[in-house]
């Protein structure tokens, strides 16, 4: 029967190398060393050796997983992926995860709720983007939908406002219509559906101010007028008209600019 012929300490605190029949066999923790009463001269069957190795592998997997969880909450899938990257066997990984689930350190239902609540508090994602991100973290569709179902529409407003807040400062630079369109586009890109996007825009402090609208028309119109300065007059005005229309200005506002009522067009040409 195999016999322990030597036990030496590792550089890592609390770890020991076990030599059997004068050859290195495996390493164990101080806890395993004490619990198994592993001493020089101890006889071990092959079954004993395999049992010790398995216990060490399971213990190492749990320690790695606990360390990973100490930084922030994780999904079951994330923990399994992390252990896999650290070359932990599938059996040890599954055992560790099951242990952590039983201890309630891992719970995908709680993880989904916490992820959503954190997004509502400081994030900028709408339901569709949250759904996609949680699926990337390996959560089942029914778990995600159950967590999303618990959230009222009004609770998404703050996240939506964080998406579009910077556009408020574009007043006087862009037309009211263009600002609203940009806000709509950003909200949809961040996963807000039509109904939620409309709700956010209702809450957005964005009112059509005539002075700011005229200032935006002056800036955008002057920019376009200079851009097409090489074109003959009729073609130039047509291009400017198209440019301003695409940027959200009404026909009346565009005509006012082209008639020189907003700014003297000849003065623009001098710059």
Swiss-Prot record:
Belongs to the RecX family. Transmembrane segments: none annotated. Modulates RecA activity. Keywords: Cytoplasm. InterPro entries: RecX_HTH_1st, RecX_HTH_2nd, RecX_HTH_3rd, Regulatory_RecX, WH-like_DNA-bd_sf. It holds the Pfam family RecX_HTH3. Its main location: cytoplasm. The gene is recX. GO terms for biological process: regulation of DNA repair. GO terms for cellular component: cytoplasm. It is found in: Cytoplasm. This is Regulatory protein RecX.
């Amino acid at each position: 029967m195999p016999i322990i012929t030597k036990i030496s300490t590792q550089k890592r605190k609390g770890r020991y190398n076990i030599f059997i029949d004068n050859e290195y066999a495996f390493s164990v923790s101080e806890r395993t060393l004490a619990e198994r009463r592993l001493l020089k001269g101890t006889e071990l069957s092959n079954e004993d050796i395999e049992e010790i190795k398995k216990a060490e592998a399971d213990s190492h997997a749990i320690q790695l997983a606990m360390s990973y969880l100490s930084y922030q909450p994780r999904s079951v899938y994330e923990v399994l992926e992390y252990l896999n990257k650290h070359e932990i066997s599938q059996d040890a990984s599954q055992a560790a995860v099951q242990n952590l689930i039983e201890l309630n350190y891992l719970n995908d239902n709680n993880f989904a709720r916490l992820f959503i609540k954190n997004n509502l508090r400081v994030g900028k994602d709408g339901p569709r983007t949250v759904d996609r991100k949680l699926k990337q973290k390996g959560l089942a569709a029914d778990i995600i939908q159950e967590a999303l179902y618990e959230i009222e529409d009004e609770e998404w407003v703050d996240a939506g406002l964080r998406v579009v807040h910077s556009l408020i400062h574009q007043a006087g630079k862009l037309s009211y219509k263009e600002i609203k369109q940009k806000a709509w586009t950003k909200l949809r890109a961040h996963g807000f559906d039509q109904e939620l996007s409309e709700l956010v825009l209702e809450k957005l402090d964005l009112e059509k101010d005539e002075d700011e609208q005229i200032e935006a028309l002056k800036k955008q119109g002057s920019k376009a007028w200079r851009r097409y300065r090489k074109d003959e007059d009729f073609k130039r005005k047509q291009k400017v008209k198209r440019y301003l229309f695409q940027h959200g200005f009404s026909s009346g506002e565009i005509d006012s600019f082209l008639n020189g009522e907003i700014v003297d067009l000849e003065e623009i040409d001098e710059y």
